[in-house]
Swiss-Prot record:
GO terms, molecular function: phenylacetaldehyde dehydrogenase (NAD+) activity
Entry's Gene Ontology BP terms: styrene catabolic process
Its biological purpose: Phenylacetaldehyde dehydrogenase that catalyzes the last step in the aerobic styrene degradation pathway by mediating oxidation of phenylacetaldehyde to phenylacetic acid.
Annotated protein name in UniProt: Phenylacetaldehyde dehydrogenase
Chain positions recorded as NAD(+) binding sites: 251-256
Coiled coil: none
Reactions the enzyme catalyzes: 2-phenylacetaldehyde + NAD(+) + H2O = 2-phenylacetate + NADH + 2 H(+)
Native source species: Pseudomonas fluorescens
Domain of life: Bacteria
Amino acid sequence: MTRSLTMNSSLPAIDGLRLPHQMLIGGQWVNAQSDKTLNVYNPATGDTLTDVPDGDVEDVNAAVESAAATLQSDAWRRMPPSARERILLRLADLLEAHGDELARLETLNNGKLLIYSKMMEVGASAQWLRYMAGWATKLTGSTLDLSLPLPPDVRSRASTQRVPVGVVAAIIPWNFPLLMAVWKIAPALACGNTVVLKPAEETPLTALRLAELAMEAGLPAGALNVVTGRGETAGDALVRHPKVAKVAFTGSTEVGRIIGSACGRSLKAVSLELGGKSPVIVLADCDPQEAAEGAAAAIFFNHGQVCTAGSRLYVHESIYEDVIQRLAVIGESIVVGSGLEQGVHMGPMVSKKHHENVLRHIRNGIEDGADLICGGTEAPCAQGFFVKPTIFANREKKDIRLLSQEVFGPVLVATPFSDIAEVVNEANRSVYGLGASIWTNDLSAALRINDELEAGTVWVNTHNMVDPNLPFGGFKDSGVGREHGAAAIEHYTTTRSLVIAY
């Protein structure tokens, strides 16, 4: 197994970009102990970009042991909270200083538009790091009065303290590779935990570069480890490792169930941010053009590869035809192509496998009798994993598969409704409950619908708006626990009680 303290300067390069191809364990850049590798692809072309280690049980064991040792080390355990804060703030500065590089690397590996990579991956990641850095110095306990009887000459003092949970396993998806990594590691490190991060096998490159910058920011060796590999090997070993105290996972509900079950058996803390099938509800008073633009943004942002994508559109019957006609115009006008090209509005699906899965869902919509308004299965580009923006009209309110199955792509089904009770019932029929949006000028109606929706986040006249101070998570099959804000801090700390008799 090859080891080095710094990332190899002779890495493969594309257009001047260094492409990481080793993982970080204990402050050293290493290959897998098996020397096996995984290919990493450019989804805009289907070409191989580089390869990364195909980590397995032995590599996970090494990473967790490193994280556990650092957790107990004076370098980390005795580090003042203000020092952890400074490291995270420096890391935010480094992300911005290397913003162009990181954005291009993300677009090459993930396929998203370069502007999204700059704004959401780099810009938002820096914002989240700065917000979570502040929590390092603001963890508080409480002082309590006890009621149990004591001898007359004995008094007591009691207090609580928020302490790190321990080694955190952070397993992230491929749709926002850099941002999702920061969503996990920033609160974990701010609270004094150590982390083993496993990025998605499709999109590991910016996570590896993030780890390199974290070392440059002053993070002690072993505080952050990155293991690349497949979910069924590296991910499974990480979830089951006895020295991992908490698992933080974002991904599919299917995998989330497996992880949650494993954590339950081993009594690990776990937070799961899982699938979604978010409804977009347009009331009769909404301007049809605003409704169409809002619905298009809700489903086509990031190529539809968003857990809260507004994939179920419900429009009041009085403006239904007007709205879907305007939506069709928007869908047909979207330019599909490489995220690095000027004038492109939507990039590729992340992988060949996912591309085929999205096309299967489109075929299901056609087979189930929905009206294809725009898009479809025809390839818009000669190469790469591209899908046309696709809109189905479900005028007859059929119980089609697209209403229940998460597509995770640019595929929308639009259904009319006649009254509030009907649309609330339809919105809540999904097994998912991650997000929902309501489009109206009637605030009273919006608030009444909000009270009935089974969703972790409800937006009014916007969609997909998140903030580091705003808790984010789902109801029902969309997961357990919350990201962001004070709610996230609770998941990365536990309570120690102290009682003094004197």
